[in-house]
Design a protein with these regions (language model features):
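Hydrophobic/small/kink-forming positions within alpha-helical transmembrane segments
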Residues: 61-65, 95, 149-153, 210, ...
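Flexible interhelical linker loops that connect adjacent transmembrane helices
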Residues: 7-10, 183-210, 252-267, 328, ...
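Transmembrane-helix exit segments and adjacent C-terminal regions of multi-pass membrane proteins
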Residues: 1-20, 385, 395, 442-500
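N-terminal transmembrane alpha-helices
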Residues: 12, 16-36, 44, 57-68, ...
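Helix-boundary and loop/linker segments of multi-pass membrane transporters
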Residues: 5-13, 98, 198, 226, ...
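Juxtamembrane non-transmembrane "cap" segments at the membrane-aqueous interface
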Residues: 420-441
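Helix-loop-helix hairpins in multi-pass membrane proteins, especially solute transporters
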Residues: 60, 67-204, 231
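12-transmembrane solute porter fold
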Residues: 15-29, 34-38, 45-58, 71, ...
Length: 500
């Protein structure tokens, strides 16, 4: 058996949890502010939108490399080592972004940020499941959900105000010291709460994972702009797909896999993971399409659009701990069913958007939609990991975070592609029906605006169908029979069983 870390009852969970939440909040905040800053960064470095978008793309690609190996890292290194490394690296990356004199330097900063953030999220989830007993995990994950949801809610609005008042550099100058303070607090407050071993790193698996996930993520991020039949995009999908097939095959053969695919033998985990992936894709429809609608159709600035979407994010943050308490008492099934029912109705309501839809309609529908999402997201995630038990939790955390990352990338590319293709088709149809001449700029602009809205409506209809599919699957959720206690509640930690 490997080294067993501290498992005493004397360890206080509150200070550890508080430091973890602070780290999660600042990292989630960082993820949502970059898109608001892109126009000003383009001006500062005199670069194109395609070049500036690499600040988002490189962060996603780095996450795609780091997140799949987090299960190995959590088994190999202690809680303190990993958290201090991830927060320290994140703080350094943020400071580099703040002082960046050129685009290449800020790009390097984003890579370093992503390395820290990619480790941070799976690590925090694993620690929460370790220090809290099963009957309190729902509430604990709900509190974690406050950071996950509230930071993205205020991020765009806060960043928009900072950038308009000061500069995009200031945004990073504020985030960096907060991350540093959390790093310093972790030195004194974060204890080792999990078990460590000395597993052998599957180097070939890491290479295949990097090529596979990196190829697919980059393919989806560029397919919407270059076209899905572009030779580069097709090559990325082929190379990425073949690499992932080889990666899965190898992970089923090696003794210490990077991602443990045999956890899909657990029925509830598999079911909730499928629902999680579907809901993540559906959620990204609103995250990507609503800002486009508010800015391109109503002429809002990013800051104004952020204010419109702010209530929905706040509702998600407020509801997270409440939903966690309800999950601890009633389980995930009916929370998922109710949440998905609300999501279906409100997503369908967004298929009725027009060029003159009132602001109040958009705010209310989007906010209620986020309320529905808040009821189901954390319960299905927690229920799936509970089904695995603590011994396999790190594998489940790495797997779900990896699949959600892929689902987010696919969702963004998928819905933007639907909006674009359907929008162009609607514009042509409107021009033919109204007999609009391409030289009539006023009528052409009106047709483009109307066609774009119709394309957005079509994309939300697909999101509605996805929500219906998840709703049907939710009826098959059962309550996990596992009652495994957190190691800190035990006198000893059991050895991790090997899946066969």
């Amino acid at each position: 058996m490997g080294n067993t870390e501290t498992t005493s009852r004397s360890i206080r969970t509150t200070p550890i949890f508080a430091v973890l939440l602070a780290g999660a909040f600042v990292a989630f905040l960082n993820q949502t502010v970059i898109n608001v800053a892109l126009p000003r960064i383009m001006e500062s470095f005199d670069i194109s939108a395609a070049t500036a978008n690499w600040l988002s793309t490189i962060f996603m690609l780095t996450n795609g490399i780091v997140i799949p190996v987090t299960a190995f890292l959590m088994e190999r290194y202690t809680t303190r080592q990993l958290f201090l490394f991830s927060m320290g690296v994140f703080a350094i990356g943020t400071f580099i972004c703040a002082i960046a004199p050129s685009f290449s330097i800020i790009l390097i900063g984003r890579v370093i940020q992503a390395i820290g953030a990619g480790i941070l999220f799976p690590l925090i989830t694993n620690v929460i499941f370790t220090i809290f007993p099963i009957e309190r995990r729902g509430f604990a994950m709900g509190i974690f959900g406050v950071a996950m949801n509230f930071a993205p809610a205020i991020g765009p609005t806060w960043a928009g105000w900072i950038i308009e008042t000061y500069s995009w550099h200031t945004m990073f100058y504020i985030i960096a010291p907060v991350a540093l303070i959390d790093f310093l607090a972790a030195i004194f407050l974060v204890k080792n709460v999990t078990e460590t071993r000395r597993p052998k790193l599957d180097v070939l698996g890491v290479i295949l994972s990097t090529i596979g996930f990196g190829g697919l993520l980059y393919g989806f991020s560029t397919g919407g702009t270059k076209g899905w039949t572009d030779p580069e995009v097709v090559t990325l999908f082929i190379v990425g797909g073949v690499s992932l097939i080889l990666f899965v095959w190898r992970q089923l053969k090696v003794g210490h896999p990077i991602l443990e695919f045999r956890i899909f033998k657990y029925r509830l985990f598999t079911l909730t993971t499928i629902i999680n992936v579907i809901v993540t894709m559906a959620m990204f429809s609103g995250m990507i399409l609503m800002p486009i609608y508010m800015q391109n159709i109503h002429g809002f600035t990013p800051l104004q659009a952020g204010f419109v979407l702010l209530p929905g994010g706040i509702v998600m943050g407020v509801m997270s701990p409440i939903t966690g308490k309800l999950f601890d008492r009633y389980g995930a099934k009916w929370l998922a069913i109710i949440g998905l029912a609300i999501t279906i109705v409100t997503t369908f309501a967004l298929t009725k958007l027009q060029t003159n839809t009132s602001y109040s309609y958009v705010i209310w529908v989007y906010t209620i939609r986020m309320f529905g999402m808040s009821i189901l997201m954390m319960p299905i995630f927690t229920a799936g990991l509970n089904d695995l038990g603590l011994s396999l939790n790190r594998y489940g955390t790495a797997m779900v975070n990896t699949l959600r990352m892929v689902a987010g990338a696919v969702g963004m590319a998928f819905f933007v592609s639907i909006m674009t293709n359907q929008g162009e088709a609607h514009v042509k149809s409107i021009m033919n029906q109204e007999q609009i001449s391409p030289t009539d700029k006023a009528q052409l602009a009106l047709a483009i605006k109307q066609g774009t809205v119709m394309g957005i409506d079509d994309a939300f209809m697909i999101a509605t169908y996805l929500s219906i599919a998840a709703f049907i699957l939710a009826f098959f959720i059962r309550k996990s029979g596992k009652k495994e206690e957190a190691p800190m509640q035990k006198k000893a930690v059991k050895k991790v069983p090997q899946l066969q």
